[in-house]
Curated annotation (Swiss-Prot):
InterPro entries: AcCoA_carboxyl_beta, Acetyl_CoA_COase_Trfase_b_su, ClpP/crotonase-like_dom_sf, COA_CT_N, Znf-ACC. Its EC number is 2.1.3.15. GO terms for cellular component: acetyl-CoA carboxylase complex. Residues 24-280 form the CoA carboxyltransferase N-terminal domain. The gene is accD. It comes from the Bacteria. One of its GO terms (biological process) is fatty acid biosynthetic process. This is Acetyl-coenzyme A carboxylase carboxyl transferase subunit beta. The lineage of its organism: Bacteria, Pseudomonadati, Aquificota, Aquificia, Aquificales. Zn(2+) binds at C28, C31, C47, C50. Its cofactor is Zn(2+). It catalyses: N(6)-carboxybiotinyl-L-lysyl-[protein] + acetyl-CoA = N(6)-biotinyl-L-lysyl-[protein] + malonyl-CoA. It comes from Sulfurihydrogenibium sp. (strain YO3AOP1).
Amino acid sequence: MGLKDFVDKLKNIKKSRIKIEEGAWIKCDKCKNILYIEDLLKNLKICPHCGYTFRMNAKERVDSLLDKVYSYDLFPKIKPVDIIGFKDTKRYKDRLKEAQEKTGLNDAIIIAHGNIYDREVVLASMDFNFMGGSMGSVVGAKFVRGVEFAIEKSIPFISVAASGGARMQESIVSLMQMAKTAIAIDRLNKAGILYISVLTDPTMGGVSASFAFLGDIIIAEPESLIGFAGPRVIEQTIRQQLPEGFQRAEFLLEKGQIDMVVDRKNLKKTIYTLIRHTHG
């Protein structure tokens, strides 16, 4: 082997190591420690040093809560359509394609069916990685069908919100989903079916103003940003500085807007206990 070939080989080895290292480690946003991703996943994406909770995708959330999964998505054939031919800096069609390739999902929600320990449930899990978890026609349609499935089987319905709000690319159609999901929850209530709403970071806009705050029991993960408009928008509007921790889960608990703040490690057990005590 010549000197040039040897040097090229060393460069290739170095490049492959860099790729492996870049994909294997992540920095904690809070304490800035470097974490091994495999260990982080085993710890429910909670930093072992400071307890900071990284955002989970929809499937990770299902895996963290359900012991047995009958279906990760009961309605996989429902797909988004560019109803109004929306275009900003990109066409909506292109944004959808990019999000689908990035996440492997059709849209920002999956409706899972499975067991938490020995209790059968329906779990609506949102994915912030899909266009900011924005709610459009598909999110609304799948959510409603999930509720109908829970009513049909007389089993608890759980939603895990992670969203920036309504999807602007669908205009008024996205806003319609607020009423649509709220009406579905009303049917769930009339059927006497338990609805537990879990709010994660972030739960904002049209999602917070609809199904996310309609739970019989509302749980939030620690330090989650929860509200309608963001804090910067509010400060600019009222021209006042907001209180420390405003719109964080602990602040909302103190003001009586949610029922409890539960650490991710205790979330499954807490939900199970609530189901046992309220759903027979």
